[in-house]
């Protein structure tokens, strides 16, 4: 790889783009002896597995002993065997069942094939069988699966919620009575709104297990010490900062019940990492300060060069449209070079492809026939594609966890591999180009979810009552708000309160299926349909708040490679009509926001400044969209503004906030020029802090919002708010409240290191700002943060 990197540095387009180069050394594998059933030994040997890695053996031993397990090792480290071995052992010994849950059907398809092959290797008489139960099967296929009674069932949280738990007593009693193992794959994916929903689903699952006394066979055998209704939980995770705490939060199990296995003992070769920062535009090219050349174009150059050089390469990018476009462009460039065979074997991979097409590309990567792929993060999940020579990251994927997962696809045995991260121009990308140590040496991000979100809890309590009557002790599943929620639902007529010999019980007394009245992926039920005005076909569905932001009259809406203009928004019928256009501009809404502090829940004095108190609170955020701005697509400069009349929205959520001491405010105002200097300083500090949330937590910058004001009625002084962008909050700002000094310090470092003069997309400008990034004072924001934390 050293020679290849030198060759890249000699290419005509090279202009000093390599900002950092590191080599992660390889290692030899370490193994452990595990006593296995002879049938399982034979099946594993037929699959090429002669011994278990030490980390696999540790996990197997822990599950055998009745512990819950978190296995947090990198991509391609063999996590699946850690749960497959005990699952198959229990099926062989006792006909016990295992429930495997993954967030994506593509991963389930891959696991079903792998586990089914291993089960067949055990022989027909073993009684071990594998089946998936997802939305991909029709009614007859699902009936056949239930009649067959597989010992290992693979499903998604959505199907567990909609199709299994509501029928646990009528259709699935045979499964839950023998359930000993629950496997949660990709547990790090259960964060934010989705993670909060799924955490409640798993608490409902635990209630059902208790009703069926799941795990009883294991407890009566020589293995395990579980309590009644308590199957073993095996959680597989990417490398995150809080694997045990997150697994406990998601599953509802005690953190002390989990055994952590996080040392990868599989063999790897050396991985060469390049941080590739595209050059800035020349001053005469019509772009603002700090603007850099496209990461897509830079990635394509590397992709074409490396594929032509014989390296099997995958480029990860964020959107389906980019993957499709640049796969086509890359193949065209290869043909222009005379590389016709390689060009024929370059493809795009994304979730919208059919299962068959995705499988063809996966098999081609595994066999080596496919030479290059442009992919969304769909290939980031644990689908088996073998090892690659090169992985390119077209822009920082948003979290270090995702970057290492994607980069972990590189590596063929112990051969050297290359990972190049090509930076975009936004804050996170440029921060990491300037602070590579933070990427390689800091603790991984934490996964955050909130299973006590009071906006979600009532729907899940209704669903739980529909699945199995409630009792007063169920607050151990649903937390402190449970009694109040039950009282409210009883008063509303959704629950029927009964006194029995065993105590109080609440039965579901509502209409229909509460499970089907909610989605696990969203909060709130009002949606707006976007349709093509030419034919009435639906283009997309947005939540009400998102529709006001993205589908207002005059908005440019981008969907699957096509631009549309919103020509009408009918909020009486919740329908927006769109027409295809080819504009040279994009749009961004303008809005006014106010925040009301409803209740302060926690407070702390800033450790670096004893006159600053940081608080965590319940707040109400009211937003009024007032208009929108048009921006030139090439230069990013504003070219026109229009007013809008849309309804106000209210978000009840959680926030951290802090005030600026009067002395510091006076110093900032004195150092500035004009009345907008201080408002610009606190506004820029707010933007910068929000932009760096994903460095500490697994989230997107749009998951949080902010407000800075020179005088707030609750505090009567200058105040900066940062709030969760979802009703009830998902735990992000609560966790940030606990580490706010680190967040401020990182933001200060970003502002100081950015070479721009007055603010740019790499430091304080935000693509989501409702005030058109005005005013912003980057230098004064740095002075403000320095006064707070230094």
Model regions and ranges:
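Helicase-associated low-complexity/disordered flanking segments
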Residues: 1-57, 67-68
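Conserved SF1/SF2 helicase motif Ia
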Residues: 88-111, 126, 209-214, 227-229
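Conserved strand-helix element at the start of the C-terminal RecA-like helicase core
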Residues: 98-111, 303-333
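SF2 helicase catalytic motif II
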Residues: 158-161, 165-212
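Post-DEXD/H (motif II) to motif III coupling segment of the RecA-like Helicase ATP-binding lobe
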Residues: 188-219, 223-264
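Conserved interdomain linker/interface between the two RecA-like ATPase lobes of SF2 helicase motors
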Residues: 232, 240-251, 255-319, 461
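Conserved SF2 helicase motif VI
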Residues: 398-419
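Extended Lys/Arg-rich polyanion-binding regions
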Residues: 417-419, 425-442, 450, 460-472, ...
